[in-house]
């Protein structure tokens, strides 16, 4: 089993690459010693964003939300995301994220402050919605 533990990452990236309908979604975690890029389904990232957003919202408006969540290129996919487990540690006021591959042979974990979680939720939402055509009624 390959395990990657980051604590609080130095950087996070999220992006979608390719043509609409065939896009590859990635989540990138950078620590002091390594950068790990994971392939995700759009629905997995959307669910993560929704959960992070709800936790941040429940805790009240956090401080400054970072907005730099660009993926560092080029990248190599370390593994495909199977399950994402998220827990809010209320005592420490952090969000713990654990991601495993479908066969559970690979795993990574990292911790987010409410500010980083809020910024990441926004970045994920932007990446997920970027390929959608504009609504003909909304413009």
Task: Identify the meaning behind each predicted range.
Residues 1-139:
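Positively charged, low-complexity terminal tracts
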């Amino acid at each position: 089993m390959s395990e990657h533990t980051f604590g609080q990452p130095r950087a996070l990236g999220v992006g979608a690459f390719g043509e609409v309908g065939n896009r590859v979604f990635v989540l990138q975690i950078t620590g002091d010693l390594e950068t790990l890029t994971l392939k995700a389904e759009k629905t997995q990232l959307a669910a993560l964003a929704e959960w992070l957003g709800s936790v941040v919202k429940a805790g009240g408006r956090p401080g400054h939300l970072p907005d730099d969540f660009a993926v560092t290129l080029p990248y190599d996919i370390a593994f495909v995301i199977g399950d994402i487990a998220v827990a809010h540690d209320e005592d420490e006021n952090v969000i713990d994220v654990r991601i495993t591959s479908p066969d559970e042979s690979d795993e990574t974990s990292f911790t987010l402050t409410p500010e980083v979680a809020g910024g990441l939720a926004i970045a994920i939402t932007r990446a997920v919605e970027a390929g959608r055509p504009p609504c003909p009624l909304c413009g």
